[in-house]
């Protein structure tokens, strides 16, 4: 965690902790009360719009999961979606927006590579290939 603390701004670290706590709270409440189910759905959408969480997830899970597992592919897909969503909130053409788009594109390429390799191993047809 010392390395992680050096890499992340304190505000981002606290933001992640708060997001986790809020997620647990809304999840337990949504089980008990239908009214909170909408709140839980909104929270899920809000979390996907945070690029820093995508990076933390990759740093945390990538060393643990097998390199060519579908979970790693889906992890990269989620990261791509989150980073693209955050880039969409910024003004078009800014340096930060362009940087986020490049990072999202890299995650998308990695996701495609991992998932298409898995499909090839199991003989699943790739519908994107031209016949």
Question: What do the predicted segments below correspond to?
Answer:
Residues 1-131:
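Extended alpha-helical scaffold/coiled-coil
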